[in-house]
């Protein structure tokens, strides 16, 4: 498990920047999914349930002004930066694994 910091800038306005920290990369990726789900709930307040596919999630990520991760590396005792493409790849792997486990 590597401590992970998620940096989020929803719009071009720098005062909207925020961050969240997680105990692992997977927890962070789940946090990104939850952030999108909260966005969907705000956009559809009267909907009893929220459903989406991965392409919609990726479009949401692409529409953010900035989204990046800093992942702690114990070997160098530094944080390694990662961009949106890396985040989308990790989310894809996480969701595919969850779908496979649900199908068992």
Curated annotation (Swiss-Prot):
Give compartment(s).
Answer: Nucleus
**Phosphothreonine (modified residue): where?**
11
Q: Does the keyword Membrane apply?
A: no
Give the UniProt family note.
Belongs to the E(R) family.
> Which GO terms of the molecular function aspect are on file?
methyl-CpG binding; RNA binding
The gene is ERH
TM segment ranges? none
Q: Which PANTHER family match?
A: ENHANCER OF RUDIMENTARY ERH, ENHANCER OF RUDIMENTARY HOMOLOG
Tissue specificity, per the record, is: Expressed in all tissues examined.
Please give the function described in this protein's UniProt entry: May have a role in the cell cycle.
Q: Where in the sequence is N-acetylserine found?
A: 2
Its name, as the record gives it, is Enhancer of rudimentary homolog
Its quaternary structure?
Homodimer. Interacts with POLDIP3. Component of the methylosome, a 20S complex containing at least CLNS1A/pICln, PRMT5/SKB1, WDR77/MEP50, PRMT1 and ERH. Interacts with CHTOP.
Name the UniProt key words of this record, in alphabetical order. Acetylation, Cell cycle, Isopeptide bond, Nucleus, Phosphoprotein, Ubl conjugation
């Amino acid at each position: 498990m590597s401590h992970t910091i998620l940096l989020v800038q929803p719009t071009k306005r720098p005062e909207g920047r925020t961050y969240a920290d997680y105990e692992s990369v997977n927890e962070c990726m789940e946090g990104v999914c939850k952030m999108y789900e909260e966005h969907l709930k705000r956009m559809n307040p009267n909907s009893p349930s929220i459903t989406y596919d991965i392409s919609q999630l990726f479009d949401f990520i692409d529409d953010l002004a900035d989204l990046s991760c800093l992942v702690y590396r114990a070997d160098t005792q530094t944080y390694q930066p990662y961009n949106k493409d890396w985040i989308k790849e990790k989310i894809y792997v996480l969701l595919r694994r969850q779908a496979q486990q649900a199908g068992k």
